Amino acid sequence: MADARFYFSDARTWRYMVASIEKIIEEGVFVATGEGLSLRALDTSHVAMVDLYYPNTAFIEYDIGGESVEFGVSFDLLSKVLRRARKEDELVLEVEGSRLAVKLKSRGERTFRIPQVVMTYEKLPEPKVSFTVRARMLGSTFREAVRDLEPHSETLTLRALEDALLLVGSSEMATVEIELSQSRGSLLDYEAESQDRASYSIEYFSEMLSAAQAADAVVVSFSEDAPVRVDMEYLGGGRLTFYVSPKIE
């Protein structure tokens, strides 16, 4: 009998989330409590943090058999398994002692068992950052903007205008400016207390693109020369958040 069981309706959502997570962190510890399933970890350079939370109500079945369960995973291994997820697949995760069973269910059932990673769980605090700018957009808008900038710059600069968000990238050969606004339909919501700006390594934004593919919406929050917070919102109240430290020039 499994120590814990999590049954989710859409395996591909987890496929896309884990594809982004594994580009930033190698290993991590999931913590399941009565409220939900969570993960919080820093990358090795301490430039980026990944913060995942899914409420228990988002699962078809959520059974932890006690107050809490912790299980460590290699995201490289988990991502390789989840790449096999098809459009119609449901996902079951079962904690079986020192192993994690990953089941993909549709017309049949495929089971992959991978070893848990033994690591000390360190509860990281949530970053204390005040944001003056908040822009909410579709996942497709976020993906297209980052892809337009990727070939031309190693740095992404966010600039808050009065009624629009400006994304800027430049190199010796080209400068790219992308303006997103509610009036043009590219933003779902926009708030700017001041016209702040901040710059970040575009590499981290590129690594978020898989997760954005499955997101209902993406929220970008930042302040002058402060860490950016990028929230991926998913069906059922799930959330995958990335914090990235700024590049100070």
Swiss-Prot record:
Belongs to the PCNA family. It comes from the Archaea. PANTHER family: PROLIFERATING CELL NUCLEAR ANTIGEN. GO terms for molecular function: DNA binding; DNA polymerase processivity factor activity. Homotrimer. The subunits circularize to form a toroid; DNA passes through its center. Replication factor C (RFC) is required to load the toroid on the DNA. Gene3D superfamilies: 3.70.10.10. This is DNA polymerase sliding clamp 3. InterPro entries: DNA_clamp_sf (IPR046938), Pr_cel_nuc_antig (IPR000730), Pr_cel_nuc_antig_C (IPR022649), Pr_cel_nuc_antig_N (IPR022648). Sliding clamp subunit that acts as a moving platform for DNA processing. Responsible for tethering the catalytic subunit of DNA polymerase and other proteins to DNA during high-speed replication. Keywords: DNA replication, DNA-binding. GO terms for biological process: leading strand elongation; regulation of DNA replication. It comes from Aeropyrum pernix (strain ATCC 700893 / DSM 11879 / JCM 9820 / NBRC 100138 / K1).
